[in-house]
Amino acid sequence: MSAEKKYYAVMLVDDNEIDNLINQKMIEASGICEHIFIHSGARSAIEFLKNIEKLAKGPVSLYLPEIIFLDIDMPLMDGFQFLEEFDKLSDSIKNHCKVVMLTSSLNPQDMNKAKKNQFVLKYINKPLTQENLKKI
C-alpha cells in the first residue's frame, strides 16, 4: 500500500447504482484507498466477505475492506439486517471492518439504532463529501 493511501480497500453497499457511481468517484478523488468494492445488495456484500475468508491465502486482513459504507433502505436485506448478518461473521472480519452508515434516512430512530451498534463507526447523511471522508 502506498504511503498516501489511508486504507487498502473500502466497500460501498447501496442498491442505488447512481449513488454507488457518485460515491466511487468521490472516494477515488480523495485517494484514501487502493481498492473500492461495490455491491448493489447487502446479501452479496455479506457473501463477498465470507468468500474472502474462505479463499484468502494468508491473513484475511490483507484482502478485507477496512471501511464499509452501508445504506439503510435496500430491498431484500436492509442495512440493519446486514449488521445482524455481519455479527455472525468471524472475529477476524468483524475486528477488521468498520461500518459507516451512508444513507438518505433522516429518521432519528435509524440514527439512534445505528449509533448503538458496536460495528458502526459513523452515521453520515448522503451525499458523501470530501469533508466526510477526511473525518473517517
Regions found by a protein language model. Name each.
Residues 68, 122-123:
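Two-component signal transduction core modules
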Residues 53-69:
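Active-site beta3 strand of CheY-like receiver
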Residues 47, 80-93:
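Short amphipathic alpha-helix used as the core "switch/output" element in two-component signaling
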Residues 13-18, 41, 71:
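Acidic di-acidic motifs
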Residues 74:
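Receiver (REC) domain active-site loop signature in two-component systems and cognate sites
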Residues 38-51, 79:
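Helix N-cap/capping motif at the beta->alpha junctions
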Residues 1-11, 17-32, 61-64, 125-136:
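Non-catalytic signal-transmission and effector/linker regions of two-component phosphorelay proteins
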Residues 25, 81, 94-100, 105-122:
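Alpha4 helix (beta4-alpha4-beta5 surface) of REC/receiver domains from two-component response regulators
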